[in-house]
């Protein structure tokens, strides 16, 4: 609180005591409650859903422990908590479009999302392998060094040399199904996925062949 120190008003008048400022009432905004992750609750929700709230289990598509057995559905195991939460929130607010996922998250609370993400982060990722030996060199070049002449930066700069990503910043890519990674790069390029300006910018510079090569290479990272 500011304090006004009184003095002489003028040399021509007698000194008068300074008037104290009227007390100011301040109302502090309530501090938002800190949400703590409950991985056990996330486990239950992931594997069983919550029929009373219309929440379907995740395991049916994303597999036991987040290791999807189908290339069109992403592996979620060992993914960074903050990244998973962001994607779920983006589906719910429409920033990221996917009719199936938007329906799945419609009744999830912020607590549900954090619990699911915390559970998945603790699961062991089943590693994959690169399938196309003819494109390994190109994929490795793009991932490690980028393509300078096209303005494509190295993927490793953000997603780390082994594809583990950086918690709270960039997702894990190692071991992910190549088909899924390709589909996301195409979505960024075509504008059907818009929740990363950085990735949209990079993807617009990539050809189909480059996307396939780097996606296959990332599938084998460990």
Residue ranges and their predicted role:
Residues 15-17, 69-75, 91-131, 167-172, ...:
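Axial heme c-ligation environment in periplasmic c-type cytochrome domains
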Residues 37, 41-45, 83-86, 100-103, ...:
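Extracytoplasmic/secreted proteins, especially bacterial periplasmic and envelope-associated proteins
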Residues 55-64, 116, 152-161, 214:
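The canonical Cys-X-X-Cys-His
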Residues 43-59, 81, 144-156, 168-183:
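Sequence context surrounding c-type heme c attachment/ligation sites in exported
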Residues 30-32, 37-93:
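The feature marks the first
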Residues 16-54, 122-148:
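Electrostatic cytochrome c docking/interface patches
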Residues 1-39, 89, 209, 219-222:
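N-terminal export/targeting leaders of redox proteins
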